[in-house]
């Protein structure tokens, strides 16, 4: 599956958070470049890339080798939540109904 997220964090900060977050869920870094990371573990394989996108945004893309809504995909969404919290620590995430 592919997941996308746009954040105000700079690319190096996104990669730093990924390097901290993903090993906590049992993923081991298997490759890296200046703008990407590759992880693998019991949950599957994950590719993460970041790029600057018009103005002050960073576009984050995650691809997994899993089908449907796997545990790895749910953790990718939790990673996006961690990015959101890092970008705006005052914002309180709650249900909107």
Across the structure, where does each feature detected by a protein language model lie?
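Short, hydrophobic/aromatic-rich segments at coil-to-beta transitions
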Residues: 31-39
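Terminal, regulation- and interaction-focused segments at domain boundaries
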Residues: 1-30
